[in-house]
Amino acid sequence: MNPSTRSCRRLHALALLSVASVVALCPVQGRCAADDLAPPHLQKSGTATQLVVDGRPFLVRGAELNNSSASSLDYLRPLWPRLVASRLNAVLATVSWELIEPEEGRFDFKLVDGLIEGARENNLRLVVLWFGSWKNGKSTYQPLWVKANQARFPLVKSEEGRSLNTLTPFGDATCESDARAFAALMRHLREVDGRRHTVLMVQVENEMGVLEESRDYGAAASREFSGPVPAELMDYLAAHKDALVPELRDLWTANGSRASGTWTEVFGPGKPAGKVIPVRTLCPPMTEQEHETAWRGLFWPVDEIFMAWRYARFVNKVAEAGRAEYPLPMYVNTWLQQRDHAWPGTYPSGGPVPQVMNIWQAGAPAIGILSGDIYVPEFEEECARYVRCGNPLFIPESRGDARGAAQAIWAFGRHDAIGYSPFGIDRVAGPDFELAQAYDVVAQVSPLILEHQGNGTMTAVLVDHEGPPQSVRLGGYQIEARSSARAGGPTPPERVAGLFISMGPNEFVVVGRAMNVYFSSATNPAENVGLGTVEEGVYSDGHWVPGRRLNGDETPEWKALRFPAERYSIQHVKLYRYQ
């Protein structure tokens, strides 16, 4: 028996043992077991969308491994304890096409099995990242039998006919082979994990799109580009016209809201002939007006929309093949447009950036979440753009420093995020990792966060150390958070978060750091608001365990909550009003 088969059987036996235990504990017609055995899925809760695992909503406190880490179980072995110490509950890890199908039709899942076993041994969950045809706008993770056969698996062509190092999404054989491999992976996950649910979600491809060109100029792509826009896309746009993102709606309107036509007739001009895309990290020379048009909008719109549709159709076929085997939630991620590379082709053209999210929703209904890898300074703006059109917020790549810790807390509280994940956890994992301390507090209040998602009783702010106060309205109160640091104390991070949960009339749970929090009446300016009781404490198994009762100097001017600069903490406050 080879190691792969032995590993598979061991995992299968463990899964069956787990199921037997659940049934034994829930003997009434196996009802509890049936609930638990439903695969992870997305489910609406009020205005929020939640990830449901084993019958309960699950908040992903994630981190992504470096791209090559999961290619070696020996490399991972000493890393697992550090991941646990980082207070994660989920690890995002690569599964690459080249390693599971080194020869066409021969699959090897021993790395996948080892990854699952490692996660289980450390009480962690997994989000699998399928690196198939694309990674970061290039094609480097497919098997050699794909790379070496460009006649069967063609590459994107530049305007002058040069081959780019990325597979074209117009290659039928590429799509079929990718989908077949992905289906085999999902079938294997169902066989070894369909009852344990170690794997929560799957990312399909990675940051796909064309770099160094705004679109594919190959023969197949050019034929499609010169033809009509597919009726299914036009029908979708017409049916959702009033709900389209404004970038796309305004563009379509400006071009006459045509119900049919060629790509350029419907969506406007593409890249001017002969315009050369420079190195991807630099923007072409632009006037100020051109830059403002490109930034946060659609520049050379038809090229990006055309490629978005084709990538979406390709990815949808791959996702459908996988979901037919095991219907885990699936998402796609993207490299975002940025100020210093704002034209399509200086970032991957055709990926699910916010301005083309409706194209992706039309073309890839098998994908449940469109996600941005948010490293840009405009974090709040990007999150707001991704929660449009019913899209849930999941952040698969971002920062893991103090700023990232604040972003995670804010995303959970402000936008009902399903999860947050910094990239490259290998380098920094451990209890002293900035995000670890924030995740510890998030873990404590996760039951509250999940309970209050989608019902308007939770919000959050981001406060800059030298910035203005931030104010929100919640539960009949105006809440103002001001940056604060005691003289002689530690220097606070440049940005912190405050999370506010309304527990009922005049009662709040607040998470914060390096800030003072003030409450005032949101309905009657003549009313004063007093602090009835203030407790610091922790949550243990969902129950509040009070520590100190705060008063005096710990409540500045007897009217504010004070959060120390050293770390995030939790306070529980009851308020009263007086004239």
Regions found by a protein language model. Name each.
Residues 14-26:
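Bacterial N-terminal signal peptides
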Residues 33-89:
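N-terminal carbohydrate-binding accessory modules
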Residues 70-84, 348-363:
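Short, acidic/polar
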Residues 121, 135-341, 362, 366, ...:
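Active-site region of glycoside hydrolase catalytic domains
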Residues 315-328, 354-451:
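Catalytic-core region of carbohydrate-active enzymes that cleave or remodel glycosidic bonds
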Residues 409-526:
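Aromatic- and carboxylate-lined catalytic core of secreted/periplasmic carbohydrate-active enzymes
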Residues 488-491, 507-579:
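C-terminal beta-sandwich/jelly-roll accessory domains of carbohydrate-active enzymes
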